[in-house]
């Protein structure tokens, strides 16, 4: 406890700017083996091939892996690493994992085809979005089974380990960075104006055998725009409501330094981000901001004990209004109502209406009352003008400490380390919720011009002044580890290491009864001979309360080997080869990640959610219904994997490369396989099931990743070019659900895990004769099909098109695109640096359905019409139509998953371009500014894709943006 108090006091001293810990000594450097390997020496070169062009100096030689840091030359594959602190010198970023898929092979939004990953910050489970790039030293992506084994069950799908910055043994440094930029929208949805909507809605009614709803005169008046208050034409994306752009700015100060006894680091940051909304209360409540403070200190108490204390706090406030503007923009039709009622157009002598004006709390700009109708008594515009505002508050505090004991006095090479972390997060919404009245105008033009003859009022104005608290959320993380480490070299060449550890964490959340837990023991034994031959055994003994007693613990072993063949006699004298190493790993990792909840092994009865029954009319009673059977033999699902790796450098580090191939199986996923049991064990009504959850479904994943880097000085320009890529395939190798399918093409076994199934379209029905001569589709449409509806292929030739005719259409890329590519280019001339980064995603498809695009593409009933309906089917356009006929009913036949709505998500994005200039030292003189630089950059500048218009489209949410930024940085 005394040590913790000392550490906290030292952190506070640093934050207050005390120079007591400064040192005039030169900057501390981690020693590394020479990069210029001679053929007479067995020293191993630096490895720029380790997956990122930014890993090219000696400081980067140590890589954070599970519970330790190792020389990157000694990595055994399945690990990618990015030096964020060095990358930020030429690539300013705003998010911790920004463009990571273009820098770390194997990462494609997830890792090696899996659906999630564990994020660790300094070894503890934390949110990636709560640590900024300016705070990060290094990001390690642990992909292979051997790399993640020590973390146990929760790491079975991979680990992204974020290492934050720390101080060093050097005189105090103060780094300041400031940025300011603007965001501009890429694209907005395009909806029809009032007149066009009304015209096409009339057409939809005629298609349904109904009469027109809107008269020709009404359509003309809406089209003319002569009186937008009487004949509204709402455009949510006009400059009346939105700005052309919004700004973002940030400021970061870093203070670091220390000596051989104590080292410290402090990061103080602030950012603020705006919004496009620019009217009503949104104009003053459209910003979010965040203040953060991070500090750590490393203290060498004596020759045996070292201590570290880390703490961070963040304070986020997001201001907004009490409505969903973007959601309403996708649903509110343009002619529905007028947002504002002009007071100037009130008829003279209309005293009742004038009383409304005089008594209103909300006269907008002194000229307007809030508009609405009986059906729109609360609406998005009135809510923004008068409904009040809110603040979303998020506060996080994170604390961790660790102590290291050098036990070489007991046994040479022995050490002990223990860590403890306690994190708190709380969030809630503070809101002022106001009530307001809206008014519907009654119009006349008997005077020869439009005027309001009367107002109908709906609702009342009221302000309580009370601040309402809602959406409260609380989370607590507690993590602990303790480990014995052994590291010793025998006879100069025999390097032996081992780790015995205990590791665990639990995450408690508000309104969640069971905490998220991870607990395991770990054992690692490693050996390498002269950095030529490697062997590593990593294992975990895990525990999970989600399994039945007797099956809650399991052993997860892995084995990795490596061979640096460039040190063998047959390659040692090949001057073109600087370094060449091959690796292999295999293992079994037990996991409870995909066990959705607790007690699945235990059957249960339900009462509250059961069916009703009664022996007497008017008196209903719940039954007791069984929902699942017992399975006390349930075991852990397992990740079984073998992977192979290669890495090397050629031609004196002109070329660096790495690659991994992986073959992984997830065996024993837990499902309730209704179709595998007799039908009498389950019923649909009342809902009853005696079928247990069992280990049955199996998945497969296989693929490869690679990196290829080139470094060359051409004249006065230093060039670095890097390519990264990840390709993976998935397969449902066993599915209990397949027994419900009648035909082979329906079955999920053998298909990708992200398989999209749907019908195959065959154009449109051209007329009634075409319908009569085609397979029956009446089961797809409750009212039957009509000319202009989509025609589908009858896959099983039974004369009926139904869900049994759905086939495999493509991969959804839900865990990341099947093929992810990244390219980065750096050119440095004197003090000027150019950097560009691009990402490519290929091989996936998506549906233009309501899940992604609301009713933008699937338009029927009372939906708002988008520009896609201009290609609708009519008798005149039947040969060139690109969209089904319009209807005011429910278009069950047309709006279902089929290849008609399928599109490719293949794309290449120019994600970043930055030009940086470092001012020469002679320009700065001998003042207090030691270094000064400036840069300009652009984010998300260009997308090249066949379906770019769709890929850049957001429906029902704020638009995607491009960001242009100017930044400066200085060292004091």
Predicted regions and their residues:
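Extracellular/periplasmic, surface-exposed regions of secreted and cell-surface proteins
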Residues: 9, 296-305, 311-315, 350-356, ...
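Outer-membrane beta-barrel proteins
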Residues: 124-167, 187-191, 232-252, 271-310, ...
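C-terminal extracellular loops and terminal segments
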Residues: 690-700, 740-757, 809-822, 826, ...
């Amino acid at each position: 406890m005394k040590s913790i108090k000392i550490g906290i006091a030292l952190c506070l001293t640093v934050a207050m700017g005390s120079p007591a810990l400064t040192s005039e000594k030169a900057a501390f450097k981690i020693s590394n083996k020479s990069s210029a390997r001679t053929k007479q020496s067995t020293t191993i070169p630096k490895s720029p091939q380790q997956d990122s062009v930014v890993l090219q100096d000696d400081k980067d030689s140590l890589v954070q892996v599970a519970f330790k840091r190792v020389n990157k030359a000694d990595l055994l594959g399945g690990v990618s690493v990015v030096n964020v602190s060095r990358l930020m010198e030429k690539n300013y970023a705003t998010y911790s994992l920004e463009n990571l898929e273009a820098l770390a092979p194997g990462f494609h939004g997830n890792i090696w085809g899996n659906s999630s990953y564990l994020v660790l910050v300094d070894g503890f489970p934390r949110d990636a979005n709560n640590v900024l790039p300016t705070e990060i030293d290094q990001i390690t992506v642990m992909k292979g089974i051997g790399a993640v084994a020590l973390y146990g069950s929760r790491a079975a799908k991979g680990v992204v380990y974020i290492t934050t910055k720390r101080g060093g043994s050097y005189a105090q440094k103060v780094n300041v960075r400031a940025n300011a930029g603007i965001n501009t929208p890429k694209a907005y949805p395009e909806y029809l104006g009032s007149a066009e909507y009304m015209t096409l809605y009339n057409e939809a009614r005629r298609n349904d055998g109904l009469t027109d709803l809107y008269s020709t005169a009404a359509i003309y008046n809406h089209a003319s725009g002569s009186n937008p208050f009487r004949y509204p034409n709402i455009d949510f994306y006009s400059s009346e409501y939105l700005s052309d752009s919004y700004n973002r700015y940030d400021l970061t100060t870093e203070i670091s330094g220390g000596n051989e006894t104590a080292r410290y680091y402090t990061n103080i940051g602030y950012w603020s981000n705006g919004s496009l909304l620019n009217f009503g209360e949104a104009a003053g409540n459209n910003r979010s901001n965040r203040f953060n403070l991070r500090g750590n200190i490393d203290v060498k108490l004596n020759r045996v004990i070292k201590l570290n204390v880390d703490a961070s706090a963040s304070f986020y406030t997001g201001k907004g209004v009490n409505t969903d503007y973007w959601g309403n923009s996708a649903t509110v039709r343009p002619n529905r109502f007028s947002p504002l009622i002009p007071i100037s157009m009130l008829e003279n002598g209309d005293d009742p209406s004038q009383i409304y004006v005089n008594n209103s709390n909300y006269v907008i700009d002194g000229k307007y009352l809030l508009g609405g109708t009986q059906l729109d008594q609360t609406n998005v515009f009135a809510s923004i003008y008068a409904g009040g505002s809110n603040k979303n508050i998020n506060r996080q505090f994170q604390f961790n400490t660790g102590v290291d004991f050098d036990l070489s006095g007991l046994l040479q090479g022995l050490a002990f380390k223990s860590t403890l972390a306690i994190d708190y997060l709380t969030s809630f919404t503070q809101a002022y919720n106001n009530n307001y009245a809206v008014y519907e105008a009654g119009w006349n033009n008997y005077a020869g011009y439009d005027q309001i003859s009367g107002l109908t009022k709906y609702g009342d104005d009221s302000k309580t002044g009370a601040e309402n608290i809602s959406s409260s959320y609380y989370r607590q993380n507690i993590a602990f580890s303790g480990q014995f480490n052994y590291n010793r070299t025998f006879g100069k060449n025999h390097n032996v290491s081992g780790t015995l550890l205990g590791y665990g964490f639990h995450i408690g959340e508000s309104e969640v009864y069971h905490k998220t837990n991870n607990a395991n023991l770990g054992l690692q034994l490693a050996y390498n001979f002269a950095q030529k031959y490697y062997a590593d055994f990593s294992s975990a003994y895990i525990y999970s309360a989600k399994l039945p007693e007797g099956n809650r613990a399991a052993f997860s072993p892995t084995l990795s080997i490596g061979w640096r063949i460039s040190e063998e006699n047959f390659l040692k004298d090949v001057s073109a080869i600087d370094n060449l190493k091959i690796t292999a790993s295999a293992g079994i990792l037990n996991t409870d990640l995909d066990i959705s909840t607790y007690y699945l092994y235990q059957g249960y009865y339900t009462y509250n959610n059961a069916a009703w029954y009664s022996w007497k009319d008017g008196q209903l009673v719940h039954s007791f219904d069984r929902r699942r059977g017992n399975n006390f033999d349930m075991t852990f699902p397992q990740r079984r994997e073998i992977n192979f790796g290669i890495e090397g450098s050629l031609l004196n580090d002109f070329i660096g490369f790495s690659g991994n191939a992986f073959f992984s199986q997830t065996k024993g996923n837990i499902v309730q396989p209704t179709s595998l049991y007799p039908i009498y064990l389950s019923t649909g009504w009342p809902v009853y099931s005696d079928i247990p959850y069992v280990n049955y479904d199996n998945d497969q994943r296989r693929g490869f990743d690679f990196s290829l880097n080139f470094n060359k000085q051409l004249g006065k320009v230093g060039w670095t070019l890097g390519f990264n890529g990840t390709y993976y395939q998935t397969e449902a190798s066993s599915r209990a659900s397949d027994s419900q399918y009648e035909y082979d093409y329906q079955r999920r076994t053998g298909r990708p895990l992200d398989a999209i199934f749907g019908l195959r379209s065959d154009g449109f029905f051209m007329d009634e004769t075409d319908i009569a001569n085609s397979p029956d589709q009446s089961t797809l449409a409750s009212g039957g099909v009509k000319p202009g509806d989509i025609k589908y292929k009858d896959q099983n030739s039974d004369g009926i098109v139904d869900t049994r005719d759905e086939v495999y259409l493509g991969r959804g890329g839900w865990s990341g695109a099947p093929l992810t590519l990244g390219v980065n280019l750096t050119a440095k001339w004197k003090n000027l640096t150019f950097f560009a980064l691009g990402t490519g995603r290929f091989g996936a498809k998506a549906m233009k359905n309501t899940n992604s695009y609301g009713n933008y593409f699937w338009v029927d009933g009372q939906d708002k019409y988008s520009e896609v309906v201009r290609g609708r089917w009519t008798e005149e356009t039947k040969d060139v139509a690109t969209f089904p006929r319009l209807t005011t009913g429910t278009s069950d036949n047309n709006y279902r998953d089929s290849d008609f709505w399928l599109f490719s998500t293949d794309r290449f994005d120019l994600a970043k371009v930055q030009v940086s200039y470092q001012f020469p030292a002679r320009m700065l003189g001998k003042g207090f500014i030691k270094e000064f630089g400036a840069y300009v950059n652009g984010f998300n500048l260009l997308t090249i894709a066949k379906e770019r218009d769709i890929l850049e489209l957001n429906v029902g949410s704020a638009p995607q943006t491009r960001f242009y930024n100017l930044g400066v940085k200085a060292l004091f």
